[in-house]
Amino acid sequence: MEAEQRPAAGASEGATPGLEAVPPVAPPPATAASGPIPKSGPEPKRRHLGTLLQPTVNKFSLRVFGSHKAVEIEQERVKSAGAWIIHPYSDFRFYWDLIMLLLMVGNLIVLPVGITFFKEENSPPWIVFNVLSDTFFLLDLVLNFRTGIVVEEGAEILLAPRAIRTRYLRTWFLVDLISSIPVDYIFLVVELEPRLDAEVYKTARALRIVRFTKILSLLRLLRLSRLIRYIHQWEEIFHMTYDLASAVVRIFNLIGMMLLLCHWDGCLQFLVPMLQDFPPDCWVSINHMVNHSWGRQYSHALFKAMSHMLCIGYGQQAPVGMPDVWLTMLSMIVGATCYAMFIGHATALIQSLDSSRRQYQEKYKQVEQYMSFHKLPADTRQRIHEYYEHRYQGKMFDEESILGELSEPLREEIINFTCRGLVAHMPLFAHADPSFVTAVLTKLRFEVFQPGDLVVREGSVGRKMYFIQHGLLSVLARGARDTRLTDGSYFGEICLLTRGRRTASVRADTYCRLYSLSVDHFNAVLEEFPMMRRAFETVAMDRLLRIGKKNSILQRKRSEPSPGSSGGIMEQHLVQHDRDMARGVRGRAPSTGAQLSGKPVLWEPLVHAPLQAAAVTSNVAIALTHQRGPLPLSPDSPATLLARSAWRSAGSPASPLVPVRAGPWASTSRLPAPPARTLHASLSRAGRSQVSLLGPPPGGGGRRLGPRGRPLSASQPSLPQRATGDGSPGRKGSGSERLPPSGLLAKPPRTAQPPRPPVPEPATPRGLQLSANM
């Protein structure tokens, strides 16, 4: 090599001045490169074999070591530990353990049968199986001295040869050595087995029982880390979750262990009489099965063992000899233990598959006991049951604890996903900064309200605002028309902005799923995002103006300049959407009621309170008798008023709507659809009723009537709506008397008070109302 390289170098030095000497430079690299081929041939194979002994980068190694860098460090540790050191998480060790596991299970099944039912084991298949098993067990014994050991206590891996040897000699070496003695090799070499007498033969057969100690080696292979590795690989194949895979593996391991114990017990039932040369009182001699085939002997022995283990009998007959008695007791003890273990594991497995539903059932049992202890009425219990069903839907989680254990980015991702429906339907979040949306969502609390619940009570101190995920709610303000809120709306922010009291009541009309934001979290978020405070204040002021109220704090803040043009555009979008939503829900309100016919009806809860409704009907008749108006069959008669106002009464939120026939005078008139007046009754739970008779549209005369049908003056304060006697515009009404938050109607005071100044709204019909207390 040096002789060839030196002339090439000299030629290149001499050819430097001229260009003709450049081509001869090319051959030396080829000659130099072709020289080391014989030495570099085994290097790729050795390198490939070395990678098989090292941990590879996969999901399992990343889970164990944490990162790619940690895996590379572990690979360097294997290289520096010495030659032929096998890492316990390497691919070679994984496949070797899998082969040994299968071979070991085969030995645990085949060896008891061969020892028990076969006297001559010189057949070629039996010899091949024994020799192959002994060879693999001896190789496994040698490889264990070069395989790293996982120290469970310190979560480290021993790779030093001296440390591996010392620890293996102190733990599993003796068991592996005894179970790996090549008895078949000894018999084949010296050919001792044919010349053995009976005692030597029995001794040799007893030595074969030592193979059962390989059960302890099975425990060594079934370490937790390897089980997790198998589970993860099966997850990728069958696309199963970790809980389902672990549950299936646990139940299969338990069933396999019980079947293996039954197999061993059956072989033991026949082995003991065989070692005693089948005494006359043993079950084999009694059943005359000494010379039967091994298949029939094994079947009867297995049936006898399973009968004992399952505690269903003694098999074909009760034990007679003392060895059979002791074997029966042993089988019963083992069977009872396995049965208890199986029941315990199966129960724990079933409970772990649906722990959230089990937790909900346990919680609801406590609720039932609580209701029984306090003797709550049946309707309250039903409401509590329905609340739990809608709130938890059969599953209960400790959501705060689960989210609190996660990292902040993962927690925000989960909250954004679970609240995606709320964000999609709410323009406030659609036009806001994503950081603001995330800040709000992480502080929300989920709540459920039932139909009829007052979410917000007028005049109370506000400590929360609410975002509607699903449901329909009504805003009840004194002297103002109802406003409906549905998915994507929010309410309760006015008192948080002004630090005052609630300006209106909010009632749930359906089951509502809301998210609440406390005042502390509300102020903390708005301090971080001042532009969103401006948006909340703009919408709040517009809502107050729509119900005829004002707030000096909001007006003063409204007069301040806006932070930017984008904020003003967003405020306009929010205000317009809020108005459109209120207008749209009111337009859809009549469709939520019952379908009306052309006949005049009264809407009243007759099904739930027939006696109260009958009393109300009597009061209606009295009111109609004292009404100063045209004849019953004229266009302005009470029958005409009832028929024309049927569709308006369907949208009234005063009470549940049930149709009732108005009277015999209603069947003789066919009336047009446009309403002129509305007559309906509203009942509270306390037994009080209210009858309202609304007058014609603005421009027509109308007079208010008292409880006895007498005309009232405009200054009488017993009516919630104000109207002048000459038909001038007054305060708008919704077509029905608003129930106070308590659900009761107060009696009208007898002392006159000055009337409130009217707020002209000609678009809203005025009405004359009559209140009758039952």
UniProtKB/Swiss-Prot annotation:
Provide Extracellular-side residue ranges.
119-124, 193-201, 275-297, 320-329
Q: Which domain of life is it from?
A: Eukaryota
Where do the segments described as Interaction with KCTD3 lie?
354-774
Q: Name one GO cellular component term.
A: dendrite
Keywords attached to this entry:
cAMP, cAMP-binding, Cell membrane, Glycoprotein, Ion channel, Ion transport, Ligand-gated ion channel, Membrane, Nucleotide-binding, Phosphoprotein, Potassium, Potassium channel, Potassium transport, Sodium, Sodium channel, Sodium transport, Transmembrane, Transmembrane helix, Transport, Voltage-gated channel
State the reactions this protein catalyses. K(+)(in) = K(+)(out); Na(+)(in) = Na(+)(out)
Tissues where this protein is expressed? Detected in brain.
TM spans (from-to): 98-118, 125-145, 172-192, 202-222, 254-274, 330-350
Q: Which cysteines form disulfides?
A: none
| GO MF entries | cAMP binding; voltage-gated potassium channel activity; voltage-gated sodium channel activity
Locate the compositionally biased regions of type Pro residues. Answer: 751-763
- Outline the segment boundaries, as ranges, of region: Disordered: 1-48, 682-774
Q: What does this protein do?
A: Hyperpolarization-activated ion channel that are permeable to sodium and potassium ions, with an about 3:1 preference for potassium ions. Contributes to the native pacemaker currents in heart (If) and in neurons (Ih). In particular, plays a pivotal role in maintaining excitability and promoting rhythmic burst firing within hypothalamic nuclei. Exerts a significant influence on the configuration of the cardiac action potential waveform. Does not appear to play a prominent role in the processing of acute, neuropathic, or inflammatory pain.
The domain comment in this protein's record states:
The segment S4 is the voltage-sensor and is characterized by a series of positively charged amino acids at every third position. The ion-conducting pore region is between segment S5 and S6.
Self-association state and partner proteins as the record states: Homotetramer. The potassium channel is composed of a homo- or heterotetrameric complex of pore-forming subunits. Interacts with HCN11. Interacts with KCTD3; this interaction increases cell surface expression and current density of this channel. Interacts with PEX5L.
Q: What is this protein called?
A: Potassium/sodium hyperpolarization-activated cyclic nucleotide-gated channel 3
